[in-house]
């Protein structure tokens, strides 16, 4: 009787629905894959495209000749706002100085 009362109280609640599986994740970019101890890509070993581990000297020399993928650029850490002023109703001016000495003045209209 407890199950029937729950269905009467909450008609959209279905207690017998099997749990849904989450959608498949997209594959990681190549630079995000873990590397094994020899320095080869883990994805290459799984797909069968990696070098054999019988000759470690040729594996290390050939893997160093391959161009390595570069990760995406990151936001500079040392940029900071030196001064900000309210120049009018809904307007703010920011002065940003980069580590290289470049100074940028931004005017933001809110």
UniProtKB/Swiss-Prot annotation:
The lineage of its organism: Viruses, Monodnaviria, Shotokuvirae, Cossaviricota, Papovaviricetes. Assembles into oligomeric complexes. Interacts with host CDK1. Interacts with host SRPK1; this interaction may favor expression of late viral transcripts. Interacts with host cytokeratin components KRT8 and KRT18. Keywords: Early protein, Host cytoplasm, Host G2/M cell cycle arrest by virus, Host nucleus, Host-virus interaction, Modulation of host cell cycle by virus, Phosphoprotein. Transmembrane segments: none annotated. It is found in: Host cytoplasm; Host nucleus. InterPro entries: Papilloma_E4. Contributes to multiple aspects of the viral life cycle including viral genome amplification, suppression of suprabasal cell differentiation and egress of newly formed virions. Induces host cell cycle arrest at the G2 phase by associating with and preventing the nuclear entry of host CDK1/cyclin B1 complexes. Inhibits cellular DNA replication by preventing loading of host replication licensing proteins MCM2 and MCM7 onto chromatin. Within the cytoplasm, associates with host kinase SRPK1, a splicing factor regulator, and inhibits its activity. Residues 1-94 are annotated as: Disordered. Belongs to the papillomaviridae E4 protein family. The major E4 form is first synthesized as an E1^E4 fusion protein from spliced E1^E4 transcripts, such that the first few amino acids of the E4 protein are derived from the N terminus of E1. Disulfide bonds: none annotated. Its main location: host cell. The gene is E4. Residues 52-67 have a biased composition (Low complexity). GO terms for biological process: symbiont-mediated arrest of host cell cycle during G2/M transition. This is Protein E4. It holds the Pfam family Pap_E4. The keyword Phosphoprotein applies. It comes from Human papillomavirus 29. Residues 84-94 have a biased composition (Polar residues). It comes from the Viruses.
């Amino acid at each position: 009787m407890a199950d029937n009362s729950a269905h009467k109280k909450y008609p959209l609640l279905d207690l017998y629905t099997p749990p849904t599986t989450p959608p498949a994740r997209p594959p990681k970019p190549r630079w995000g894959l873990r590397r094994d101890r020899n320095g080869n890509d883990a994805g290459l070993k799984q797909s069968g495209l990696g070098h054999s581990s019988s000759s470690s000297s040729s594996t290390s020399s050939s893997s160093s000749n391959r161009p390595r993928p570069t990760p995406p650029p990151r936001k500079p850490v040392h940029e900071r706002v030196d001064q900000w002023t309210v120049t009018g109703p809904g307007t703010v001016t920011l002065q940003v100085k980069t580590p290289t000495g470049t100074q940028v003045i931004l005017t933001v209209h809110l």
